[in-house]
């Protein structure tokens, strides 16, 4: 089975550049404490790595 990632926004994007805010929007995160679940893929991992300082990430089994 494919792994999934549970991603939670824990820090506000205020004060960060437009590209990082756009990455959060692409992940589906808008407000602090928002959580989303995505399939584990290289594309999602790359987006997470770009804004890892604002996120909390957990791997979950489906």
Swiss-Prot record:
One of the record's GO molecular function terms: structural constituent of ribosome
GO biological process: translation
Gene3D superfamilies the record matches: Ribosomal protein L30, ferredoxin-like fold domain
A single Gene Ontology CC term: cytosolic large ribosomal subunit
Top-level taxon in the UniProt lineage: Bacteria
Disulfide bridge positions per record: none
Statement: the UniProt record of this protein carries the keyword Ribosomal protein: yes
Pfam family, one: Ribosomal_L30
Record keywords: Ribonucleoprotein, Ribosomal protein
Membership in a protein family: Belongs to the universal ribosomal protein uL30 family.
Quaternary structure, from the entry: Part of the 50S ribosomal subunit.
HAMAP family tied to this protein: Ribosomal_uL30_B
Full protein name: Large ribosomal subunit protein uL30
Organism: Kosmotoga olearia (strain ATCC BAA-1733 / DSM 21960 / TBF 19.5.1)
């Amino acid at each position: 089975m494919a792994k999934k990632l549970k991603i939670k926004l824990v820090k506000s994007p205020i004060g960060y550049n437009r590209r990082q805010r756009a990455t959060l929007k692409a992940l589906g995160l808008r407000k602090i404490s928002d959580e989303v679940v995505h399939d584990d893929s290289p594309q999602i991992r790359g987006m997470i790595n770009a804004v890892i300082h604002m996120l909390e990430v957990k791997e979950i089994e489906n």
